[in-house]
């Protein structure tokens, strides 16, 4: 099969993308210019404190904040541009300039973020996509042993129940607290819960856990996220002290961390923080709530060229469709295998129904479609179908990358 028109080229122009961001594109993210933060965003953020941090490893005691005003600006942009009318979810890659870096950190090379945002997706595939894409980006930068720390604070009611029990626990044990622990409790009970002080950590061993207060819906959501991690063989631990900013965070909170220093948390490097913020749109007065989740990665601007700008990317010649829960669990493995072979796909992982997936990707008119159903998931294979002749081959996952390389070469005639 050849391109029907000579106007169809192998590469398509792109803006606001760098080399490390190209990895996100393979997972369905679209690069955009980061929304400008305006006065109304800052005003809306005044009552919401800084809550999530990514450690700056060149400043052992320094931290780079992730401001809620950025999420607010993103929500405003979603509404202003009527992204709700687009195929959902909206997956975005934001290539930001230096954010929150101090003068001292600039001496060591500027620190920059890679932001991944998914708007309009409530299912656990959103968390799994962010974690898988984030780890792939960090691995490209040389971080080969990235683990996941994860927790859930549930919905608003779950968090309220947990908060009451946590404060009650600390009050009952206040006589056993060190001055440092008491000072943290005076400031905020959750500051005490997140403390790395040895005396505070000893106290927190028996503290209530947010997961024990989850609603049935929140508990099931977390279990499904963990099922993805296990299927993808991503190492993870439950971190009960991972709470985030309770003013806007909901449900899942996770961190991408250096797996080497698991035994000594005080020396552990945090490469990224991911949070859900499902209720933020309503809180900002928007008519309809927007299910939101984002991951911010701290990327070094070192001697490599990962931050070099890309002007074009490969045009996908295939779409990917998954049918059933078993294939959905394996879908990210399929994408990662093809990403390594530099085979891009059009996909819509957050949609469950076949009709919704097809309507989302059919506008691209790809000459091939890759299908994974329940049978294929069990057999670790896919069906590769030609859309003009409806001929198809069953291809094992082990041979898929090699097969698609040949298909791509034949299609472009090179």
Mark where each language-model region is.
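TRNA-recognition modules of translation machinery and tRNA-sensing kinases, especially anticodon-binding
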Residues: 1-414
């Amino acid at each position: 099969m050849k391109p029907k028109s000579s106007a169809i080229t192998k590469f398509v122009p792109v803006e606001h993308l760098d080399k490390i961001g190209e990895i996100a594109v393979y997972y369905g993210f679209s690069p955009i210019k980061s929304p400008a933060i305006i006065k109304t965003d800052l005003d809306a953020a005044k009552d919401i404190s800084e809550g999530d941090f990514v450690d700056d490893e060149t400043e052992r005691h320094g931290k780079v904040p992730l401001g809620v005003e950025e999420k607010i600006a993103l929500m405003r942009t979603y509404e202003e541009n009527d992204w709700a009318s687009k195929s959902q979810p909206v997956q975005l890659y934001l290539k930001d300039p230096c954010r929150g870096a101090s003068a001292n950190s600039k001496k060591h090379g500027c620190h920059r973020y890679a932001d991944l945002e998914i708007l309009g997706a409530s299912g656990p595939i959103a968390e799994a996509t962010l974690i898988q894409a984030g780890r792939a980006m960090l691995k490209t930068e040389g971080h080969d042993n990235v683990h996941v720390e994860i927790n859930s604070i549930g919905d608003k009611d779950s968090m309220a129940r947990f908060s009451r029990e946590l404060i009650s626990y600390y009050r009952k044990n206040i006589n056993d607290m060190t001055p440092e622990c008491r000072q943290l409790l005076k400031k905020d009970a959750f500051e005490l819960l997140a403390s790395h002080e040895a005396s505070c950590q000893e106290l927190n061993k028996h503290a209530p856990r947010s997961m024990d207060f989850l609603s049935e819906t929140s508990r099931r959501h977390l279990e499904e996220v963990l099922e993805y991690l296990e299927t993808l063989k991503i190492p993870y631990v439950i971190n009960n002290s991972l709470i985030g900013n309770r003013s806007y965070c909901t449900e899942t909170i996770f961190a991408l961390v250096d797996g080497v220093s698991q035994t000594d948390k005080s020396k552990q490097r945090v490469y990224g923080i991911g949070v859900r913020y499902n209720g933020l749109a309503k809180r900002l007065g928007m008519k309809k709530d927007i299910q939101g989740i984002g991951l911010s990665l701290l990327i070094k601007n070192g001697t490599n060229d990962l931050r070099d700008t890309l002007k074009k990317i490969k045009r996908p010649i295939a779409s990917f469709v998954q049918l059933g829960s078993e294939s959905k669990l394996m879908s990210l493995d399929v994408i990662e295998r093809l990403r390594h072979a530099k085979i891009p796909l059009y996909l819509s992982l957050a949609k469950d129904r076949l009709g919704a997936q097809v309507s989302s990707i059919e506008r691209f008119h790809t000459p091939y479609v890759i299908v994974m159903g329940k049978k294929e998931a069990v057999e670790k294979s896919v069906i590769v179908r030609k859309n003009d002749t409806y001929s198809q081959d069953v291809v094992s996952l082990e041979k898929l990358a090699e097969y698609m390389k040949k298909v791509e070469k034949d299609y472009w005639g090179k």
